[in-house]
Amino acid sequence: MNELTNFANPVAKPETFDQIQIGIASPERIRSWSFGEIKKPETINYRTFKPERDGLFCARIFGPIKDYECLCGKYKRMKYKGIVCEKCGVEVTVSKVRRERMGHIELAAPVAHIWFLKSLPSRIGLLLDMQLKQLERVLYFESYIVIEPGLTPLEKYQLLNEDELLEAQDEYGEDAFSAGIGAEAVRRMLEELDLEGEKEDLLKELAETKSELKPKKIIKRLKVVESFLESGNRPEWMILEVIPVIPPDLRPLVPLDGGRFATSDLNDLYRRVINRNNRLKRLMELRAPDIIVRNEKRMLQESVDALFDNGRRGRTITGANKRPLKSLSDMLKGKQGRFRQNLLGKRVDYSGRSVIVTGPELKLHQCGLPKKMALELFKPFIYARLDAKGLSMTLKQAKKWVEKERKEVWDILDEVIREHPVLLNRAPTLHRLGIQAFEPVLIEGKAIQLHPLVCSAFNADFDGDQMAVHVPLSLEAQLEARVLMMSTNNILSPANGKPIIVPSQDMVLGLYYLSMLKEGEPGEGSLIADMQEVHQALAAKAVTLHTKIISRVPQTDEDGNQYMKRVETTPGRMLLGETLPKSHKVPFETVNRLLTKKEIGDVIDIVYRHTGQKETVLFADAIMALGFRHAFQAGISFGKDDMIIPEAKEKEVEETRLLVKDFEQQYQDGLITQQEKYNKVIDAWSRCGDRVAAEMMKEISAVKKGADGREKPINAIYMMAHSGARGSAAQIKQLAGMRGLMAKPSGEIIETPIISNFKEGLTVLEYFNSTHGARKGLADTALKTANSGYLTRRLVDVSQDCVVVEVDCGTDRALDMKAIVQGGATIASLGERILGRTAAEDIVDSKTNEVLIAEGTLLDEAMVAAVEAIGIQSVKIRSPLVCESKGGVCAACYGRDLARGTPVNIGEAVGVIAAQSIGEPGTQLTMRTFHIGGAAQLNEQSNLESVADGSIEYRELRTITDPRGRRVSLSRSGEVAIIDSEGRERATHRLPYGAHLLLDDGAAVAKGDRIAEWDPFTMPVITETGGIVKYQDLIDNQTLTEQTDEATGISQKVVIEYRATSRKEDLRPRLTLLDDSSGETARYMLAPGAMLSVEDGQEVKAGEVLARVSRESAKTRDITGGLPRVAELFEARKPKENAIIAKVSGRVEFGKDYKAKRKIIIRPDDGSDAVEYLVPKSKVIDVQEGDYVKRGDNLIGGSPDPHDILEVLGIEPLAEYLVSEIQEVYRLQGVKINDKHIETIVRQMLQKVEITDGGDTTLLPGEQVDREEMDEINAKADAEGRTIAQGKPVLLGITKASLQTRSFISAASFQETTRVLTDASVQGKVDTLNGLKENVIVGRLIPAGTGAGMSRLRVTASSRDAALRAAQRNWQESLIAPQTAAEEHAAELRQPVQADTGDDPLGAVVGESHGTDADAGDYLTEE
């Protein structure tokens, strides 16, 4: 019966595996890999080039050098396969085994593995609870360590130097205690560790400890101890006795001409180890003095360190040319390492590259392929076809024919290429549209022809760009290329769902020209019957393209019947109308207007949405041809006279000069500060530039009429800019207006502007000034490319395993979407934001109470229009952020696939798409941080106007009426809402402290009415009661100073910052109000910089202003913009000047000051513990004593720290904050990215939870685990009736999140390879290969896209096999040793029916169907 237990499936291929585990190799394991011990450092004999025996390239150990041939030549050829030659000891087999057979070196003394020693935190150090410094002293033979103190007073693990050791031995006797040195000692210590006991001690200590920092350290140690216990690794394996030697073909030695050799650095490192090891053996045999042996051991340790990780410790070992040698770790690390160079990015065959030229006569799905290239790329196909047709007898002859390029070959090439798509790729491939499939068209010449419309997707131009061609070989690959990657299938951009196949440059110019309408052209007002007559009239020059005419255009009604419709239009627009697809959804009106680039994009969008892909492709090709033809026929060009310098320029410049002189004088007189003068000058000049530019645009765009009443041709430069073909208003401003202000390399603006424009020419000084900015621009561009690429790489890495896994996860969480409104202007409408998302609740029309859109509907354009029409303010939608799917997201939460306009398919790699969509425009973002002066900051809002008609409603607003009868807001979290006539809330606004309210609660407002106004630059301190003011701690020249305004001569009292000299002094400047009986009624703390508005002892009434604090915004501040800001947000870094957020709602009190900080205390209403904050005194505090703050309110201005938002307000507000901040940066550059991409990345940043309470699980408080992992552990605990663990979500930056994915292969290939692998091996991690990256690395089909179904089937099948095998094992175990006949009989009965089918449990599996999900039974539903 026992042979049955060997049921390793004999037919299973080694490639079929489901997971990969990494661990620490034991010495036995290393020996079992090895084919022999390497005893000599020799490599090959330099005369015969034969490997030396027992050396690093030994043929006996590693295998033969030539296929099926032993070293001495006794056995040659296949027939001796498997024989071991008795003379040279070499097995006769293929030489390929030299790539897989390993050797080993038996070390004379153990050495520590540097990864486990030096990779922080040091694993050996944590286990032994020793410092790395002390460990190193022991390992590198500097001091002894007490291993077993015995009965002596020495402590365990105490370090002793030589003298101390001798003293101790004299005192207590040699055998009373045991001490050791070097790796042997550390090894003994690791062997004697009782991990179980250690774990119990640590858990006990953790429960008892009171200190703050102790638990962290204990948890670190606990995790290491636990990982050793769980993984089955033994601690002593971190000390090596045997070193594996990698196969010789992976560290080749190649003879160069001239008798020298090129060798891999590893050979040098191995030789070093072997030499020292052999010397050490000899010294030990000779019984050399201890000190010499010890030195040799230390050197052995160092050489092994260098082999594993050169440069990690001590000096780097260098080769002959002073270059550091590449160790095993360096082979894996970095861009040139194994992971990124060979596993993630490979070079492929069947590819070629060439320069691209434009191919305007191609169709959208075609590309021109040079015949020469095609012949080379499709060679095997041609050989096969020649053979199949019987034209060539042998392969050799076929090759000859192809080389001679006989005419039969060209005919066959045509057949081969027909319907065989090829892939074109342009580097850098920033998003998935950088590789697209086309059908090749054979062309003469040597350049690839590219269709002009796909240029924007590839970001290609024809100034010498090159592109690569790849041939998809297998039928499946061709199918995918045609169905998924064909350029005609990629009309919409995956980033924002807008068409990316949009005419540009010449085409736009031609279409703009075609659709222009001019007054007074010949034949104006004629009636022309139809298109044919229009063509005739144009040919006869009776009308021009721009004449206003009345004509009839054919239209299609809903049933598809044609009818003629009368319209007023121009012949040019009718030509355009001809190209429109025939559909009632796309009427002639869509093109009956002046078409700029943006409008043409909209037209293509409409055509795509209403008539589908095929029509769109035809339409795109048609308008491309039309655009090119008319741009060519119009002959638009411009000369220098088209750059019109406005008359008003000189006047404007003169006025500004006078103004600037005035500011200069004020500064000289000391009325304004240097900074203020600078801001005012910059402001004056930038306004001047803008006014000149406006004048110039007015003149350029003016329509002039000739003597005959015809309009003169419009200005060509204006035409190019306005149509969006080329150039922009800013560029024209530099040509014909004034060049304006320039920046220094530091980013500051130079005060003297460049007044000339390029037409006038710059003076020498101006030219010199402008060189700064020009050079910085070039330097920035270079930096930007690298930074943007790195950002994309981090984004892809964090999101690569986010795939659509199911149709609907059924979550009941949702996001609330509102329109984004800033300063009264709608930046993103509600419709834009909810388009293509799934509604998470029924959308109800509040007037009729009918359900417009049911929950779970994917909102399309028509529904969105309906929602906007009834004026709904906010809609609850599903989002990847709230999705509860395991191992990915669900289709309902994700919504529409933007590149297709349909619901997203299962298996779509939405994570990678999100990363590419955010990373690809990265190069368009700026690099700089903006320095904004006071003047430019004047756009700070200072009043509030109603956005709609309705009534207003104040919320949480305390007001007081001041002596002048105005109502003043006293709360910091007050809001005003505008309610329209149907009772719907149209907008809500925060009202700042001290705002004047112009309307009563519930008052009616019209659109544009003012509701409130306030001073944006100062924040008042307002008294709530009347009384007499008393100064407290306001002492002249200590905390108070008088400043006199020189322009007006009025002096003001200003509070200044005071540093306490002695400990007892604690000056806290404040105003107190006394009532009639001198009782204190209120106190007001004053921040440094507050200007007092009342005198000591003055009587005040309620609502008066006691003091004013100037707000930060009036000063200059740096705004981080562009790429650095996006990176800062995705990395979840703490901002420089971060705001402090109230963690609880409650009343504010000020505690006792602490050195240079003030203490703010918030007492919650529910009587729970107060929360304290320490704030630097220099900061302006936004709250006063006694104020009521809500949770999440700012106590101090600035940008909030995302971690705080998550902790205080939760996931949804955090996501909203991140999305809006990131969108803000892209919006400034005019880049559109759909919100869902950013949400997908934020979801990946929020995967981890920090355990707050471990319950009865293995989780420890304070450790971070995946939310999915915690759920799994909790489900298990719950089933067993133990208490479950609790956790709170934590936000990780993208780099951190990628390094902490559950897959160690993915993390190792990203960054910090050594650290990740060390970690993983200690824990004995298992990589289940769920993400895309891991699968690419192990060389499997990725589990996304078309691979998703395959991976699903594989999982199903393997689970079914496992179940069968388990059943088989059960009855085997009962059969192995039956004690009595009765037992044997029972066992026989238990045996399943299929037992007769032989050993292989899979033999009985009947393929009843194609393995659908249903066959898998519970397996798939369990997940």
Curated annotation (Swiss-Prot):
Chain spans, region Disordered: 1383-1423
Cofactor: Mg(2+); Zn(2+)
MF term (GO), any: DNA-directed RNA polymerase activity
The reaction(s) this protein catalyses: RNA(n) + a ribonucleoside 5'-triphosphate = RNA(n+1) + diphosphate
Pfam families found in the cross-reference section: RNA_pol_Rpb1_1 (PF04997), RNA_pol_Rpb1_2 (PF00623), RNA_pol_Rpb1_3 (PF04983), RNA_pol_Rpb1_4 (PF05000), RNA_pol_Rpb1_5 (PF04998)
Family the entry assigns: Belongs to the RNA polymerase beta' chain family.
Physiological role: DNA-dependent RNA polymerase catalyzes the transcription of DNA into RNA using the four ribonucleoside triphosphates as substrates.
Name this polypeptide is given: DNA-directed RNA polymerase subunit beta'
Taxonomic lineage: Bacteria, Pseudomonadati, Pseudomonadota, Alphaproteobacteria, Sphingomonadales
